[in-house]
Every structure is written in C-alpha cells, then in structure tokens.
A protein has these predicted regions:
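Gly/Pro-enriched, hydrophobic low-complexity segments
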Residues: 127-132, 136-207
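Solvent-exposed strand-loop boundary residues in beta-sheet-rich modules
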Residues: 58-60, 101-103, 176
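A short, Trp-centered hydrophobic/proline-enriched beta-strand micro-motif
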Residues: 42-61, 69
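Bacterial N-terminal signal peptides
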Residues: 15-28
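An acidic-aromatic
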Residues: 67-117, 180
C-alpha cells in the first residue's frame, strides 16, 4: 500500500517558527544587554577620579571648552576657559557657580542638578533610587540615568564607545528642557587629584 505524503499544516508551523525566531532574538538582545550592563557596572565600580578636557555645546549652539574633574563620590570641578571664564565646583551639598570676569558667586542645591545623579554616589545600575535605560547603536552605548524620586534633577545620558570601552560624552537635560552636550577628550582615570581643586575661588570683598 502506497504511503501518503502529508504537508505540514502551515497555519501551525508558521506561528511556531515565528515564535522561535522572536524567542531567539530576545535571547540575543537580553544577552547583549546583560553584557553591556556588566561593562557599564564595571566601569563605574572602577571609577574613582576623572580628569579630562571638554567641549560643551548648549541648546542655543554656544560652544565652550575647559577642564573637568571628578572625585567620586561628591566632588566636581568644571573650569571653563576664557572668554566664558566660569568656574563650577562642588564638594558637598551645594554646587557653586562663579563668574570670574565679574566676580559673582551663585549657589544651587546639588539635588536640583543632573550632576547629583553622578557625583552624590557612584552609579549602580541596581540602585532603586535611579532609573536606567540602555541603547546600543553602531558601537555607541547610551545609558540614560534619571532619579526615581527627584524630578528636579533632570536626566543624564552617558555615551560610551564600545571598543575600547570609554566614556565619550554626556548629555544633560534639565527640568527646564535645556539640553547641554559635553564631549570628553584626553581623559585620565583614577589619577590622584588635589582636594584643593574642589574649593571655589575666593573673591575680594567689593569696595563701597
């Protein structure tokens, strides 16, 4: 007796194949995300200090440059070159902004600045007080960091090159909607920094 050949039911096979393909894709994505998170976690676990040159581009297109220093946790210095000649320092609960051309000083609470996410404590992707999102495109890894309990802190987007794995720039979005992009160059990691870097300048008292 001749055996009949039967065709597989396409209405069953196609959904199964699609499900397998989707499952495989998500397994790859999950694995890639896990590897990426591991690299980022390792970067921050090993990060104690940073010294680098920077180029800053504001929402309006203004370009500034200077030197930046981090000593984690809690210390920050952004030293702008002329003609801006601004100095931003932090070594506690306040960010001090100084205009050295006109000798003025303004203070803002650290917790109202996007920098609070980065310098109050070293970033941990398992920190419940911080929301994180990953994106990996064309060898550039983006990590978006937001405070879970403080909308005033805005958000910070950190961009890393994949090979070699290094911090390349960050983008600050404040609670007013302004966007500032900072490109990092000539970065030196974990170099010993003088604690004096993080003190504001002392301006002479105005003469009446």
């Amino acid at each position: 007796m001749k055996k009949l050949k039967t065709k597989p039911n396409s209405s069953i096979v196609h959904p199964i194949m699609i499900a397998l393909v989707i499952t495989f894709m998500f397994m790859n994505i999950s694995f890639a995300n896990a590897v990426t998170q591991s690299k980022v976690n390792k970067f921050f676990e090993n990060l104690n200090t940073l010294e680098a040159d920077f180029i800053q581009v504001s929402s309006s297109g203004n370009v500034s440059n200077g030197k930046i220093y981090f000593d984690l946790p809690g210390k920050l210095r952004i030293d702008y070159s002329e003609p801006n000649n601004l100095l931003i320092t932090c070594k506690g609960f306040w960010i001090v902004i100084q205009d050295r051309n006109i000798k003025t000083t303004n203070n803002i609470p650290l917790n109202q600045s996007p920098f609070s996410i980065l310098i109050e404590k070293q970033i941990s992707l398992s920190n419940k007080n911080v929301k994180t999102e990953f994106e990996n495109k064309s060898g550039i890894i983006s990590l978006t960091v937001k405070s879970s309990n403080n909308e005033q802190a805005g958000q910070l987007i950190l961009e890393f090159s994949e090979k070699p794995f290094n911090l390349k720039k960050w983008i600050i979005k404040d609670n007013f909607g302004d966007i500032t992009t900072v490109l990092i160059q000539n970065a030196k990691y974990n170099k010993q920094l003088s604690h004096l870097l993080f003190f504001p300048d002392e301006f002479p008292e105005p003469i009446n």
